[in-house]
From Swiss-Prot:
Its EC number is 3.6.5.-. CDD domains: alpha_tubulin (cd02186). Belongs to the tubulin family. It comes from the Eukaryota. InterPro entries: Alpha_tubulin, Beta-tubulin_BS, Tub_FtsZ_C, Tubulin, Tubulin/FtsZ-like_C, Tubulin/FtsZ_2-layer-sand-dom, Tubulin/FtsZ_GTPase_sf, Tubulin_C. It catalyses: GTP + H2O = GDP + phosphate + H(+). It comes from Neurospora crassa (strain ATCC 24698 / 74-OR23-1A / CBS 708.71 / DSM 1257 / FGSC 987). Mg(2+) binds at E71. The active site is at E254. Keywords: Cytoplasm, Cytoskeleton, GTP-binding, Hydrolase, Magnesium, Metal-binding, Microtubule, Nucleotide-binding. GO terms for biological process: microtubule cytoskeleton organization; mitotic cell cycle; nuclear division; nuclear migration by microtubule mediated pushing forces. Dimer of alpha and beta chains. A typical microtubule is a hollow water-filled tube with an outer diameter of 25 nm and an inner diameter of 15 nM. Alpha-beta heterodimers associate head-to-tail to form protofilaments running lengthwise along the microtubule wall with the beta-tubulin subunit facing the microtubule plus end conferring a structural polarity. Microtubules usually have 13 protofilaments but different protofilament numbers can be found in some organisms and specialized cells. This is Tubulin alpha-B chain.
Length: 449
């Protein structure tokens, strides 16, 4: 089987993972103690388990996942929470002191003490796989552990498991809802370090998700659990085709093949529909056509940027539930007639479809309504460069005064790393500009002939 190991780093990574595993268990009919529910036992055997779960001799399912954090609080909550019986106790690794929102602590001083222990556990989980497909790494850009330790882990995974794909789910610091002053530093340093190690990075921006929760679910003040449950639906949709059967299945490597035209341009924009509250569910038609169109509206996207100003390079539409290929093709045909959706001219068709017949599950007493079909769209668009430019300008403001830099240098980092990381990000922004501009030049060439 094609197994996938999830690695959850730092507070954001661990808490998103909690929501994801809660959802996977519901989808596969696994109880919080790791054993199957009675109705699941009665149904046909499910072979999709083994992608994310390993089975022990006595019929218990254990997630192939590792939690790592430099401070114990978040992981202690998992150790004592409702799902404490599900996870392998040795796969919960926490340190004694945290990274204090400092990339250098996560990457150099504090992180260095924990990394070998984490990699040892990764190796054990990997040895237990018959055909390891790759890693999903969950972390945030803004925190110290997520950025520093997350980057260190990615570097070391590249050394130990060079050819295996590594997909990142990263929480991008939101413009309005910042949790620390040094987020721009951490984000740019971690992006610079992981750029060559990640094959595909799905960014999620807290503010965009706050807005979706407020607007679509009517939550006045969403908390992290509300946000994480929404993120979990997205992660579940992306991984559904690896775990269930469908008519058009998508494999981990297929994501990169279809979404990443150049190795550095690997930050797809994620959109998910329908996000509707239980109260409104009965009044929505929720047709394949409607869902597909709503994915192209900025309101349903997981990062604040406007794709109408950018160009699409590639788009993956992952449907799940009651969707027949015919409907999906019809929806795409309609999309192609829309003038607002512009593709770069060197990538004419650009739509990849995936259909998984397992309908989306909802957490009981959650905010999302139960729907019979959903779609998750992953699109590589040049508009996501807007996210980088906002971050870069904040970085420049602080770095021009060398504010807070002594905390990083004090942990053994060199100041040159800041300017190096900033230059790398500037190069990334230029790469995006060039990709969008290529299509403009192409038009002139045609005119000459």
């Amino acid at each position: 089987m094609r197994e996938i190991i999830s690695l959850n780093v730092g507070q954001a990574g661990c808490q998103i993972a909690n929501s994801c595993w809660e959802l996977y268990c519901l989808e596969h009919g696994i109880q919080p103690d790791g054993y199957l529910t009675e109705e699941r036992k009665a149904a046909d055997p499910d072979h999709g388990f083994s992608t994310f779960f390993s089975e022990t001799g006595n019929g218990k399912y254990v997630p192939r996942t590792i939690y790592a954090d430099l401070e114990p609080n978040v992981i202690d909550e998992v150790r004592t929470g409702a799902y404490r019986g599900l996870f392998h106790p040795e796969h919960m690794i926490s340190g004694k002191e945290d990274a204090s929102n400092n990339y250098a602590r996560g990457h150099y001083t504090v992180g260095k003490e924990l990394i070998d222990q984490v990699l040892d556990k990764v190796r054990r989980v990997a040895d237990n796989c018959s055909g390891l497909q790759g890693f999903l790494v969950f972390h945030s850009f803004g925190g110290g552990t997520g950025s520093g330790f997350g980057a260190l882990l990615m570097e070391r995974l590249s050394v130990d498991y060079g050819k295996k794909s590594k997909l990142e789910f990263c929480v991008y610091p939101a413009p309005q809802t910042a949790t620390s002053v040094v987020e721009p530093y951490n984000s740019i340093l971690t992006t610079h370090t992981t750029l060559e190690h990640a094959d595909c990075s799905f960014m999620v921006d807290n503010e965009a998700i706050y807005d979706i929760c407020r607007r679509n679910l009517g939550l006045e003040r969403p908390n992290y659990e509300n946000l994480n449950r929404l993120i979990a639906q997205v992660v579940s949709s992306i991984t559904a085709s690896l775990r269930f059967d469908g008519s058009l299945n998508v494999d981990l490597n297929e994501f990169q093949t279809n979404l990443v035209p150049y190795p550095r341009i690997h930050f797809p924009l994620v959109a998910y529909a329908p996000v509707i509250s239980a109260a409104k569910a009965a009044h929505e038609a929720n047709s394949v056509q409607e869902m597909t169109m709503s994915c192209f509206e900025p309101n349903n996207q997981m990062v604040k940027c406007d794709p109408r100003h950018g160009k699409y390079m590639a788009t993956c539409l992952l449907y799940r539930g009651d969707v027949v290929p015919n409907d999906a093709h019809a929806a795409v045909a309609t999309l192609k007639t829309k003038r607002t959706i512009q593709f770069v001219d060197w990538c004419p068709t650009g739509f990849k479809l995936g259909i998984c017949y397992q309908p989306p599950h909802q957490v009981p007493n959650g905010d999302l309504a139960k729907v019979n079909r959903a779609v998750c769209m992953l699109s590589n668009t040049t508009a996501i460069a807007e996210a980088w430019s906002a971050l870069s300008s904040k970085f420049d403001l602080m770095y021009s005064k060398r504010a807070f830099v002594h905390w990083y240098v004090g942990e053994g980092m060199e100041e040159g790393e800041f300017s190096e990381a900033r230059e790398d990000l500037a190069a990334l922004e230029r790469d995006y500009e060039e990709v969008a501009a290529d299509s403009m030049e192409g038009e002139d060439v045609e005119a000459e002939y």
